[in-house]
Amino acid sequence: MILDEGPIMKGQIYHVEIIASNFQKSAEFYEELLTRLGYRTIFYDKEEAGWGMKGHNFWVSQCKEKFALNGYHRKRVGVNHIAFHADSRKTVDQFYTEYLQPKRIPVLYGGPKENPWYSKGYYAVYFEDPDRVKLELAYVPVFRGFERDSC
């Protein structure tokens, strides 16, 4: 049963967990990234860390050695990518020029761009974490399927 207890939306994703090949490297990466995006550290241990903001959390854990042999690839069965909200196109552009480029974080598809086939005004930059998990920072002024609703 889903309870409606305030401003958290029914069915909203509560948390995501990434299993990393090198916890320390990934934890450092996500600590900087998520702090920049407004998350705060809620847990940090030698093989697991979590960051959160009201209503949802993001976790990173160390992969067990027996599962690490094949590594991650977004075209295999499983998660393809994770997208974070941006409040404007300017935020996406600043994130790209002030964060991704100076840190030499691998950027995909040549940098920020419009993706109108997703929805009107969709503007995003795609990049990779240390295990090549595809991440996205997206400004989405109109959500597909909700064009007539206020979003």
Predicted regions and their residues:
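Long, contiguous binding/interaction regions
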Residues: 6-7, 37-46, 62, 87-90, ...
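Short glycine-enriched loop/turn motifs at secondary-structure junctions
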Residues: 10-12, 75-79, 119
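Glycine-centered tight beta-turn/hairpin loop motif at sheet-sheet or coil-to-beta transitions
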Residues: 55, 130-132
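Vicinal oxygen chelate
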Residues: 20-25, 83-130
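Helix-adjacent hinge/juxtasegments
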Residues: 68-91
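Core segments of cupin and vicinal oxygen chelate
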Residues: 17-64
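N-terminal beta-strand motif that seeds the catalytic metal site of vicinal oxygen chelate
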Residues: 2-27, 82, 141-151
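Short beta-strand/turn micro-motifs at beta-sheet edges
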Residues: 2-5, 66-72
